[in-house]
Swiss-Prot record:
All copies of domain GATase cobBQ-type, residue ranges: 247-433
Protein name from the UniProt record: Probable cobyric acid synthase
Pathway entry: Cofactor biosynthesis; adenosylcobalamin biosynthesis
Gene Ontology BP annotations: cobalamin biosynthetic process
Annotated family: Belongs to the CobB/CobQ family. CobQ subfamily.
Origin species: Thermococcus kodakarensis (strain ATCC BAA-918 / JCM 12380 / KOD1) (Pyrococcus kodakaraensis (strain KOD1))
InterPro entries: Class_I_gatase-like (IPR029062), CobQ/CobB/MinD/ParA_Nub-bd_dom (IPR002586), CobQ_GATase1 (IPR033949), CobQ_N (IPR047045), CobQ_synth (IPR004459), GATase_3 (IPR011698), P-loop_NTPase (IPR027417)
Pfam families attached to this UniProt entry: CbiA, GATase_3
Keywords per UniProt: Cobalamin biosynthesis, Glutamine amidotransferase
Role noted for this protein: Catalyzes amidations at positions B, D, E, and G on adenosylcobyrinic A,C-diamide. NH(2) groups are provided by glutamine, and one molecule of ATP is hydrogenolyzed for each amidation.
Molecular function, one GO term: ABC-type vitamin B12 transporter activity
Residue positions of the active site: C325 (nucleophile), H425
Length: 483
């Protein structure tokens, strides 16, 4: 039977996901067979698994850090918010229904938790070490009885817990002491120690605080991780990246149910982007309608708030418009939806010659494709799809040539006048394509071409991990785990 180690935080945004990824890579580099696990995650940013299901982007990244192919076992329960306090429940990579927060809490959680723990124990039998990520805070008093992502998981497999605090936001000592006070005696016994994350400054100045914590809580500080500049995807934050301002004005519509906004990280680093929510803001060189968990409702939101008309007007005046996944569907001529919104036929924005019909089957695949859009014709791109709609167009954007490694020939997307749409999430992570596209827009403004800097998730994981390895007492963790 393998070992389990759990990382919990004093709050949401403490940095658990990336610390787990770093620990996964550290122990993998030490020669251990490691996998990540999170019993339940709530996120609109998902990724395809090896089984053809979907998992959260955080566990996808952590799997890469373990040098493993992402599996639905790493994130058995995924909740995808739909609005109006409802979420789609994805179990083992497949949607099993849509429920209200109250109904899920009272009826579904207990059953799914038991199944998730079975998956965790299976992983422990198959691997040397499972590194588990918690969710939010483990001591939200109003939710603690229903919490299936924190201490209940640790207790189920007797996993030592590292408690992480974000010192950059302030109040971290109080957060740690308060969390420890609100844990039960049994739960406190599971806590191995503390990590202070995102520190800027001289860590030696924290020594009196560490001595106080050890005396008060009886647990050691295992490390102080400095604030690390990186390009790793942030699961649920649109504002974590430093400001970048380039020559092009790139705008992304911040839809109420925006999903997979990690698609736009390369554009951020290459030029800078703005997320917009008001019609009067829309006037960019490039306007992007992103993916959505509720395509029709977000289309109607744009229509009701004048954003649709603003996009059409900006396009008429020369803006280039792109739609990704749900955004592509919205930019087409019509959508027939009896699945997500059940609104039947809805007129699209009409900038792309495409029609979409929603079906009950979700496609979740890795794709490779050849671009047909003239400025990048013949370029090879890859990405992934997570969608329930089927779209047809006489002018496809690309031809899919590989689905999960199997040969294919399937047109996808659509091309319009100064517009295109595609189902390929991650299209802009194809740096040669992005460079070609941005330089086309720059040339139209009389600007010199630029080189888009290439970077890889693998390089970013290694860079981030090196800093964590130097900052955390890994030897103490190994000793406590008995590895």
């Amino acid at each position: 039977m393998g070992k389990a180690l759990m990382v919990q935080g004093t709050m949401s945004g403490a940095g658990k996901s990336l610390l787990v990824a770093a620990l996964c890579r550290i122990f993998t580099n030490l020669g251990y067979d490691v996998v990540p696990f999170k019993s339940q995650n709530m996120s609109l940013n998902s990724a395809p698994s090896i089984e053809g299901g979907e998992i959260s982007r955080a566990q996808y990244l952590q799997a890469l850090a373990c040098r493993k192919k992402p599996s639905v076992k790493f994130n058995p329960i995924l909740l995808k918010p739909e609005g109006n306090m409802r979420s789609q429940v994805v179990f083992m990579g497949r949607p099993i229904g849509s429920v209200s927060a109250r109904d899920y809490m009272l009826s579904k959680k207990a059953e799914l938790f038991e199944k998730a723990i079975e998956v965790l124990k299976e992983l422990m039998r198959e691997h040397d070490l499972v590194i588990i990520e918690g969710a939010g805070s483990p001591v939200e008093i109003n939710l603690k009885d229903y919490d299936i992502a924190n201490m209940r998981v640790a207790k189920a497999v007797n996993a030592p817990v590292i408690l992480v605090a974000d010192i950059d936001r302030g109040g971290s000592f109080a957060q740690i002491v308060g969390t420890m006070e609100l844990l039960s005696e049994e739960e406190r016994e599971l806590v191995m120690g503390f990590i202070f994350n995102k520190f800027r400054g001289d860590a030696s100045l924290l020594k009196p605080g560490f001595e106080f914590l050890e005396k008060r809580c009886g647990k050691p500080v295992l490390g102080v991780v400095p604030y690390i500049e990186h390009r790793l995807p942030e699961e649920d934050s649109l504002a974590e990246f430093p400001k970048v301002r380039g020559d092009l004005h790139i705008q992304i519509i911040k839809l109420p149910h925006i999903s997979n906004f990690t698609d736009f990280e390369p554009l951020h680093w290459a030029n800078g982007v703005d997320y917009v929510t008001r019609a009067e803001e829309i006037k960019g060189d490039l306007i992007i309608v992103p993916g959505s968990k509720n395509t029709v409702e977000d289309l109607l939101w744009m229509r009701e708030n004048g954003i649709e008309d603003a996009i059409i007007e900006a396009h008429r005046e020369g803006s280039f418009v792109v739609g990704i996944c749900g955004g592509f569907q919205m930019l087409g001529k019509e959508i027939i939806d009896e699945v997500e919104s059940k609104r039947g036929r809805v007129e699209g924005i009409g900038l792309l010659p495409a029609k979409t019909v929603f079906t009950g089957e979700k496609r979740t695949n890795h794709l490779k494709a050849e671009v047909l859009w003239e400025p990048a014709r013949g370029m090879w791109v890859e990405g992934y799809e997570i969608r329930m709609g089927r779209s047809t167009s006489e002018k496809p954007f690309s031809v899919i040539t590989s689905i999960n490694g199997a040969r294919a020939f399937e047109p996808e997307g659509a091309i319009g006048k100064r517009a295109f749409g595609t189902y390929l999430h991650g299209i802009f992570h194809n740096f040669a394509f992005t460079e070609r596209f941005l330089n086309m827009l720059r040339a139209e403004k009389g600007l010199e071409p630029v080189k888009v800097e290439e970077w890889s998730i693998e390089e970013e994981i290694e860079k981030f991990t090196r800093v964590v390895r130097e900052s955390v007492d890994v030897e103490y963790i190994i000793q406590r785990l008995g590895l």
